[in-house]
Amino acid sequence: MDPRLRLDVLIPTHNRAPMLERCVRSVLSATPTPRLLVHVTVICNGCTDDSRDVVRWLQMSYPGMITLLEERRRGKSKALNAAIEATGGDLVGMIDDDEEVAPEWLTVIADAFTDPHLDFIGGPYVPICDTPLPDWLPDEYLAVVGAVDNGSAPRPYGRDFPGILKGGNAVIRRRALQLVGPYAEHLGPGSFSRLFSCEDEDMYWRLLEARRVGRYYPTLVINHYIETSRLSREYFRRWCFWRGVSRGLMDRRHPLPVPYLAGIPRFLWGRAGRALLRLSRLRSRRPARDVFTDELRMWDVAGYFCGRQVYTLARFSPVASRRDGSDHGYAAMQHELARMEELAPAEERHMDDVELAG
């Protein structure tokens, strides 16, 4: 019996062939360890570029180490679920196609999972951009462009952790995934031009609710390439609104342990109200970064309200369908999302192509 842990590295991709090649090579050229048997699965999620040719060429360079999987249903969660079902390794690693892992990435994984009680790990994202980050970009919203740093020391994930297990740099034991179930397919970048997210946040809370043990490792580093199209105020506004919608949807299953007002956490109302007052009174005397931070906080709460109250899960609820044992709610939701895709303006569909795999 092979004593090595089998690591499946899953990479969903959508029309990012040049980045995809760098991503795959970074995994297979990382410092090897005799304790891991590594296999990469690339999931082409509605690709219309030459991503498949890139993967086939890489398969010749790394024989037996790369699998190409097709998932025609658009959506990162769908792609991940298909790959999780198609693979069988002890560990499931997940990265995005616009990332490169650091050379020690595999070694950190092997060291961490010598602990048989550890169920999942994550690490920081180092942003890489061809242009300087704009002065107006708020520190509070760096995660919008994929910059994540939760400190220089290992620490356990849990209710007191200042963040979540981000889906672009995560390794989870398969037995833990089998326990908590697949990624929520109504969350995350998907099939129509809305910047849904939070599929990783939903998974994180389910892991914690199942009492799975996780740890953040500052040495589990990935480098994340930032597309210049994301460095605009308009993108940040859209991202914050749709992140709010996603959190409002997720709130049905994972309510926060705080007081609520009109279905929204009361502290969000307070934060948005204070931001509105500052915007109305002090706009001309404040730094642009502070002004934009307050504006984004208002987009946050507006999206949360829409997700919680307007995108009513009474109409199409995968959460409800799990309760009653049927899939009618999920099917209705998919029908509604497909209808919205048909109505989406062409320019928003282009933005969806930019966002889908990231």
Model-predicted regions and their roles:
Residues 140-163:
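Short, flexible, basic/aromatic active-site loop/helix in glycosyltransferases
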Residues 1-29, 35:
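N-proximal low-complexity "stem/linker" segments adjacent to membrane-targeting elements
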Residues 71-87:
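Glycine-rich, basic loop-to-helix element that forms the pyrophosphate-binding segment
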Residues 92:
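Short aromatic/hydrophobic "clamp" motif used to bind/position activated sugar donors
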